Amino acid sequence: MNQEEKLQIQERIVDVLKTVYDPEIPVDIWNLGMIYKIEVNDDGTVDLDMTFTALNCPAADFIVEDVRTKLESVEGVKAANINLVFEPVWDQSMMSEEAKVELGFA
């Protein structure tokens, strides 16, 4: 897989991540800044590092499964490896301007 193909897959991944929501927050996980890394590998697997807005997120399992299902539905993705990371700790500065406006922080 060449670099251009990887970039196209990464763009499609971002598009599907924008359809994943924490059930308690009306902003998608991409704009919340919960995705730290997306790496598309030559074999079509994707390594994704993500976090939660709270360490004890009650919807964690639901969100991770939604992310995995949607990533694996992207054309060109063979499998998704989702790594939960908590450093750096998520804070409001990681949100997009759009998310800050939606949530009344801007």
Regions found by a protein language model. Give the residues of each.
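Domain-level signature for proteins that mediate thiol-based redox and metal-cofactor handling
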Residues: M1-A106
